[in-house]
Regions:
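Phosphate-group recognition and catalysis centered on beta-loop-alpha active-site segments
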Residues: 3-294
């Protein structure tokens, strides 16, 4: 939809974000918040999600596990031990029992009232406001598609993985509508190189590739060149140095050096269009200062 001035008008913020992703000429850089605003709220909690929505983050990365009675809940770990005041495997406990435990803050102190949210609750908070990257969840693909269809959010939910193309195509063939999907390429591994080559040889162009590398050199340079030639976009993780070129290249380096341009600028120069971060406010401020985010 466009207004009389020629500027596009979108019904929802999600429509705008998707338009930027799908526009090959856009210089907008999407910000992905890893587990939400976990420095101020418990990771993967509703307040952590609401906080990054208020910041203007584009994608909320969250992790999913399934309870004993098949309820999808938000948690990175297989166990309750680190993120709640409970103990044991999430897969061994019912949802009702899970609700007797409270979430912990990042420093380990238990909150007064916050419980582990369900994926349903999180998606309703995110609907029309922010894209959702559901991580650690490919085994629940069918269940997640069913839920997103029920809630009307399938088109704003993203899943990533390093599975082969045929496996992904087969899994998606079971559904009329599918989640967005992005391949993850570990650029130094033989499996990663093989997967990248398969996309190139088949002439397939996913919305973006997530690249993971721990040192500079030909491996990452070759991947970047191939992706630019294909016309896809590049997703970079700055959450840990081991995922983005080694020491001195991650969020903490940007923060501790007080030099976000020196760290994040190299990924802009590389042509990255999506950056996952543990410091969303720092990254947003930098991108806005150079006109690459709104």
């Amino acid at each position: 939809m466009s207004c009389s001035s020629g500027e596009p008008v979108y019904k929802t913020r999600v429509e705008k974000i998707l338009a930027e992703i799908n526009n090959p000429h856009s210089d907008y850089v999407l910000v992905v918040s890893h587990r939400g605003d976990w420095r101020n709220y418990p990771e993967n909690s509703i307040p952590a999600i609401e906080s990054v929505i208020r910041m203007g983050v584009d994608v909320m990365e969250l992790d999913v596990k399934m309870t004993k009675d098949s309820v999808l809940v938000l948690c990175h770990d297989r166990t309750l031990d680190r993120t709640t005041n409970g103990r044991g495997l999430i897969s061994d406990i019912t949802y009702d029992s899970l609700m007797t435990f409270k979430l912990k803050r990042a420093h380990g102190v238990t909150t007064d009232t916050l419980r582990m949210p369900t994926l349903r609750e999180a998606l309703l908070v995110c609907k029309d406001k922010i894209l959702v990257n559901v991580d650690h969840a490919y085994d629940y693909y069918d269940e997640i598609v069913k839920l997103t269809e029920e809630l009307g959010v399938t088109g704003q939910v993203l899943m990533k993985g390093s599975h082969g193309i045929d496996r992904v195509n087969e899994d998606m063939s079971n559904h009329r509508n599918n989640l967005l999907y992005m391949p993850v390429i570990s650029v130094h591994s033989e499996a990663g190189k093989s997967l990248m080559a398969d996309y190139v040889n088949r002439g397939l162009m996913p919305m973006a590739f997530e690249l993971c590398w721990n040192r500079p050199g030909e491996d990452i340079e070759s991947c970047v060149a191939q992706i630019h030639e294909m016309g896809s976009k590049i997703w970079v993780n700055t959450i840990w140095a081991s995922l983005c070129g080694g020491l001195g290249n991650d969020d903490d380096a940007a923060y501790e050096s007080n030099d976000p341009a020196g760290v994040y600028g190299q990924y802009i120069d590389m042509g990255a269009s999506i950056i996952q971060t543990d410091r969303p406010e720092l990254l947003l401020n930098y991108l806005r200062s150079i006109g690459r985010h709104q």
